Swiss-Prot record:
Keywords, ordered alphabetically: Chaperone, Cytoplasm, Guanine-nucleotide releasing factor
Assigned GO CC terms: cell cortex; cytoplasm; plasma membrane
Highest taxon in the source lineage: Eukaryota
Compartments (UniProt record): Cytoplasm, Cell cortex; Cytoplasm
This protein's encoding gene: ric8a
Recorded family membership: Belongs to the synembryn family.
Role this protein plays: Chaperone that specifically binds and folds nascent G alpha proteins prior to G protein heterotrimer formation, promoting their stability and activity: folds GNAI1, GNAO1, GNA13 and GNAQ. Does not fold G(s) G-alpha proteins GNAS nor GNAL. Also acts as a guanine nucleotide exchange factor (GEF) for G alpha proteins by stimulating exchange of bound GDP for free GTP.
One function term, GO molecular function aspect: guanyl-nucleotide exchange factor activity
InterPro entries hit by this protein: ARM-like (IPR011989), ARM-type_fold (IPR016024), Chaperone_Ric-8_A/B (IPR008376), Gua_nucleotide_exch_fac_Ric8 (IPR019318)
Entry keyword annotation includes Cytoplasm: yes
UniProt record, GO biological process: G protein-coupled receptor signaling pathway
Native source species: Xenopus tropicalis (Western clawed frog)
Protein name: Chaperone Ric-8A
Length: 539
C-alpha cells in the first residue's frame, strides 16, 4: 500500500479502517530497512498521524498496529522528526511503561506485545537521533529502566520485555555521557546490573567469591545469553574509567563479586562456537575495566578434578583466556577491537600475579629450541605475537610487544632472544632501552633456562633476525685498499644525499638508551668541546 492511500485512511479516524490499513502496510514493509528518498515527506506525515492516533483511546489491536508502524518508520534516520520531540518520546515511554516521576512508588511492569513494540521503536529512535537522546535524558528514562530492573526477580516478565529493556539501557548509556554517569553514580548501576547478571545466570555460591560451576551443565540458553550480553555491554559502559581511580573497600568488594561472576561466564559455553566467542568477548572487555586488585578472585577457586593447575593455583580462567587469544589471533579480523582487550588483560594480570605470568610464559615463551627460523615464522603463539610487533596498527603492535616484554620480566636481553632485535626495536626505543637493561617493573630474579639446542647455536644467532643465518661471503674479499675506500666513500655520499633530501634521518643511541638525531648529537658534542676549551683557556 502506498503512503498516500494510507494517509487518507488514517485521516478518516476510523479505528477499524486504520488498523487494517496499518496491518497491511506493516506486513508489506516488515523486512524493509532501506527507504527511498522520494516518499520521505509522506513517511514523515504518516509518522505524525500515527503518533497522534496513539494518544486516543484505542483498541489493543489498533495500538499494536500503530506501534509496529512506528518501529518500521523509525528505521529511516532521515525521517525521524515526528518521533524525536518530547511529546512523541513521552507517548512511547508510556506505552513501554517507562514514564518516570519521583512520586511513583512502583514502576509499571508491562508485559504485553504493545510494550515490547514501544521499546523496539524507542531503541531505533534513540540510536538514530541525538535530539531523542536529549529528550530521553530530560524524561529520565534511565531511572524508569533502573526501577524496573530491580523488580525482575519478583515479576514474570517475558524474555522480549526484559531484553529490550536492557537493549534500551545499553543504548542510552552508550550514547550519552550524562545518562552513563546517572546510572553509574546516582542509581548505583554496577550493583543493580550485577544483581541482574547473577539472577539471569541463576548462580549458586560455594564461597564468598566462588561460584559453583558445573562442568557437565548444558550450554547457556539462547535467551539467557542474549540478556547476559546486554548486561555485560551496559556494565562496560559504566565502568570504563574505574580502573584509573581509587576504589574504597565497599566498591572493591562489589568489583570482586562481579569478577567472580565473570570468571563463571568465561567457563560457560553457549549454543554454538560463534555465540560462545561473542559471549566471552564481552566478558573479557568488562574484565579489562575492573581494578587489577580485584582480579585475584580469578585464581582463588580451589583446584578440583579436571582443573588446570599450576604452582598449586587454579588456572582454568587463564587457560580459557589464552585459548581465546589464540583463536582471535587466527581470525585476524579487526585486531584492534578484538585482540587488544584480551592482550591488555593478560599483560596487566601478568604484572601483578607471579603465578599467572609464569603460567603464561610456559605457554607463550617455552624454552627456545627453534633457532633456524625467524621468531615471526611459524604457528606457535610466540610466532603469531611476534608478527604483530610490526603490525601497521600502532595499538596492536604496542599491545603485543608489551605482553611479550612483561612475560620476559622486562629484561631486554631475554626479550631480544625471543623476538629478535629487529622486532623488538620499536618497544625498546619507546622505553629508552635500546642500550639494554631492564624496564621499570619489579620481578623475581629467577634465571632464564636455555635449552641445549639454544646454547649450541647461540654464538651463531643473528641478534637482529633472531635466528642462525647462513654464512655469507664477505663482499670485500679480493678488493684492494683503494677499492674498499672508494666503496666506503660512495656509501657515505649516498647516506649524505638521502639525509640532506630528508628521505632518512640518521639516528644514534644516547647514553640513556633513547634515539637522537646524529646532527643534534654532533652539535652537543661540539658545544661540550667548546666549553671545555674555554675552561682550559681560563686556566
Amino acid at each position: 500500500m502506498d503512503p498516500g492511500t494510507l494517509l487518507d485512511k488514517l485521516e478518516s479516524g476510523d479505528q477499524e479502517l486504520v488498523q487494517k490499513a496499518l496491518a497491511e502496510y506493516n506486513q508489506e514493509n516488515s523486512q524493509c530497512f532501506f527507504f527511498n528518498a522520494e516518499q520521505r515527506e509522506e513517511r514523515k506525515k504518516l509518522g505524525e498521524l500515527v503518533i497522534k492516533f496513539l494518544n486516543r483511546d484505542l483498541q489493543p489491536s489498533c495500538q499494536m498496529a500503530c506501534l509496529e508502524t512506528i518501529r518500521i518508520l523509525s528505521r529511516d534516520k532521515h525521517a525521524l522528526s515526528p518521533f524525536t520531540g518530547r511529546s512523541a518520546i513521552q507517548t512511547l515511554a508510556q506505552y513501554a511503561g517507562l514514564d518516570y516521576s519521583e512520586e511513583m512508588e512502583m514502576p509499571s511492569i508491562p508485559d504485553g506485545e504493545s510494550a515490547v513494540e514501544a521499546l523496539k521503536g524507542l531503541c531505533n529512535i534513540i540510536y538514530n537521533s541525538v535530539e531523542a537522546q536529549e529528550v530521553a535524558k530530560e524524561l529520565r528514562l534511565v531511572c524508569g529502566l533502573a526501577r524496573r530492573l530491580k523488580l525482575y526477580n519478583e515479576t514474570r516478565s517475558s524474555h522480549e520485555s526484559k531484553f529490550f529493556d536492557l537493549r534500551l539501557l545499553f543504548l542510552l548509556t552508550a550514547l550519552s555521557v550524562d545518562m552513563r554517569k546517572q546510572l553509574a553514580q546516582e542509581l548505583r548501576g554496577v550493583s543493580l546490573l550485577t544483581d541482574a547478571l547473577e539472577s539471569t545466570l541463576a548462580l549458586k555460591w560455594s564461597d564468598i567469591y566462588e561460584v559453583v560451576t558445573d562442568r557437565l551443565a548444558p550450554p547457556l540458553g539462547k535467551e539467557e545469553t542474549e540478556r547476559v550480553m546486554e548486561i555485560l555491554k551496559t556494565l562496560f559502559n559504566i565502568t570504563f574509567d574505574i580502573s584509573r581511580r581509587e576504589v574504597d573497600e565497599e566498591d572493591a568488594a562489589l568489583y570482586r563479586h562481579l569478577a567472580a561472576i565473570l570468571r563463571h561466564c568465561l567457563l560457560r559455553q553457549c549454543d554454538g562456537e560463534d555465540r560462545t566467542e561473542e559471549f566471552h568477548g564481552h566478558t573479557v572487555n568488562l574484565l579489562v575495566n575492573l581494578p587489577l586488585m580485584c582480579l585475584d578472585v580469578l585464581l582463588t577457586p580451589k583446584v578440583e578434578q579436571g582443573s588446570v593447575e599450576y604452582m598449586g593455583m587454579n588456572m582454568d580462567t587463564v587457560e580459557v583466556l589464552i585459548q581465546f587469544l589464540d583463536r582471535r589471533l587466527d581470525r585476524g579480523h579487526k585486531l584492534r577491537e578484538t585482540l587488544t582487550p584480551v592482550l591488555n588483560l593478560l599483560t596487566e594480570s601478568s604484572r601483578v600475579h607471579r603465578e599467572t605470568r609464569k603460567f603464561l610464559r610456559a605457554k607463550v615463551l617455552p624454552p627456545l629450541r627453534d633457532v633456524k627460523n625467524r621468531p615471526e615464522v611459524g604457528n606457535t603463539l610466540r610466532n603469531k605475537l611476534v608478527r604483530l610487533m610490526t603490525h601497521v596498527d600502532t595499538d596492536v603492535k604496542h599491545c603485543a610487544a608489551e605482553f611479550l616484554f612483561v612475560l620476559c620480566k622486562e629484561n631486554v636481553s631475554r626479550f631480544v632472544k625471543y623476538t629478535g632485535y629487529g622486532n623488538a626495536a620499536g618497544l625498546l626505543a619507546a622505553r629508552g632501552l635500546l642500550a639494554g637493561g631492564r624496564g621499570e617493573g619489579r620481578y623475581s630474579e629467577d634465571e632464564d633456562t636455555d635449552t641445549e639446542e639454544y646454547r649450541e647455536a647461540k654464538p651463531n644467532i643473528n641478534p637482529v633476525t633472531g635466528r642462525v643465518e647462513e654464512k655469507q661471503p664477505n663482499p670485500m674479499d679480493g678488493m684492494t685498499e683503494e677499492q674498499k675506500e672508494y666503496e666506503a666513500m660512495k656509501l657515505v655520499n649516498m647516506f649524505d644525499k638521502l639525509s640532506r633530501e630528508q628521505i632518512i634521518q640518521p639516528m644514534g643511541v644516547t647514553s640513556d638508551g633513547r634515539l637522537e638525531p646524529l646532527d643534534e648529537a654532533a652539535q652537543k658534542m661540539l658545544q661540550r668541546q667548546e666549553s671545555s676549551d674555554l675552561e682550559s683557556d681560563s686556566d
